[in-house]
From Swiss-Prot:
Protein name per its UniProtKB record: Energy-coupling factor transporter ATP-binding protein EcfA1
Source species of the chain: Staphylococcus epidermidis (strain ATCC 35984 / DSM 28319 / BCRC 17069 / CCUG 31568 / BM 3577 / RP62A)
Pfam families: ABC_tran (PF00005)
Recorded topology in the membrane: Peripheral membrane protein
Function comment: ATP-binding (A) component of a common energy-coupling factor (ECF) ABC-transporter complex. Unlike classic ABC transporters this ECF transporter provides the energy necessary to transport a number of different substrates.
Name of the gene encoding the protein in the UniProt record: ecfA1
Annotated EC: 7.-.-.-
GO molecular function, one term: ATPase-coupled transmembrane transporter activity
UniProt keyword list: ATP-binding, Cell membrane, Membrane, Nucleotide-binding, Translocase, Transport
Listed SMART domains: AAA
Residue numbers binding ATP: 42-49
Amino acid sequence: MNGSNPIIEFKDVSFQYQSDAAFTLNRVSFSIPAGQWTSIVGHNGSGKSTIAKLMVGIEEPSEGQILFQNLPVDSQNKREVRKHIGIVFQNPDNQFVGSIVKFDVAFGLENQLVPYKEMVSKVNQVLTEVDMINKADDEPHSLSGGQKQRVAIAGVLALNPDVLILDEATTMLDPHGKSSLLNLVNEVKVNNHVTIISITHDLDEAMHADQIIVLNKGTVFKQGTPQDIFKCEEALISVGLDLPFPLKMNRLLGFDSTYVTYEGLIKKL
């Protein structure tokens, strides 16, 4: 992808939760380009959430190898790897530990014994970046779903990660909240030079990515740019995925079957 060096590589990775169980992942190989947005897409049971656990060393591969910046992700190195990767989950409530927003964002910095003045400055910086500085003294649980995700992202950004993983982070948001959050994530990628990995079943979300990896039954089904992936509409439908809204409307209205974004569909109309 555009000559970018891979920050994460999966090399013939297989995984099973028990030695006598079926493989959740089977000989999976792919690379995540540094500084770009990769979306890992699949229906429930395709293995996408297992990949997120493997990336940060929560689980270890049964076979094959995972590299982070050429460093093996294994029991010996996983603590070092985790310093560089932040995760935002579907339900951010589980990540909140403080009574107000700014304390939650500061939590990771406190654990790193960051000096107080530096910590306050960093918290204000990242809350401003995610447009939540006006909620700094609010209780996290009083916020909307989209606002909670912004706070969770701020907490990750405070630690200056190289990689931000979004594990079904937009699933519980309404269309406006989802669109707003995805625009923010793209800004984070550009402004902070952070590699984005979104784990999702939602092809509308995947349209924002630079690279899409489609999983099916624990294997890589397709991999490429959005333009490459969405040329294969029938194949995507065959593995249980819903087409993005612009492509659905494109088919419904009888337009040509070329890849189309929201903006492109509006121009056709």
